[in-house]
Amino acid sequence: IAGYMHDIGNAINRTHHAEYGGLLADGILKKTDMNIKDRITIVSAISNHDESTGGAVDLVSAALIIADKTDVRRDRVRSEKGKAAFDIHDRVNYAVTQHKLKVNVDKKTISLNLQIDTKICSMYEYFEIFLGRMMMCRGAADMLGATFKLMANGSKVL
């Protein structure tokens, strides 16, 4: 449920969308027969999933953070904008030509492997936008008792 609702706050504003999302989700979930403990877990995960204000506070928030922050790929970009209208976030996502997230339960690793077209976006630009997100994934993996690994264009980064 947290994963499904986590970006609902964008309906109000991109800035502080996690906090707005927590408030909106709480209002919606109050109308269900969900018990308070589960509702708090979901609202907390939504409220803490943004790198500017949040972090992993429990297993659910850790899983949400990893799922959200590792979702970097070309098809996230709406192509009708045209490349000339891409901002840096669009360009970074568009530059990712391959992505693979792998969880190895036995080795307790969560690995993200990206292939980035450096003709579209430099590695510097990628890390300017995504380093904080990848560090947040590392903290979330720690919360899950795992190690987060990042490979970009065949090179180990984290």
Segments the model singles out, each with a brief description of its role:
Residues R74-L158:
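Terminal helices and disordered tails flanking the catalytic cores of nucleotide-processing hydrolases
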Residues I1-V103:
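Divalent metal-dependent catalytic cores for phosphoryl transfer on phosphate-bearing substrates
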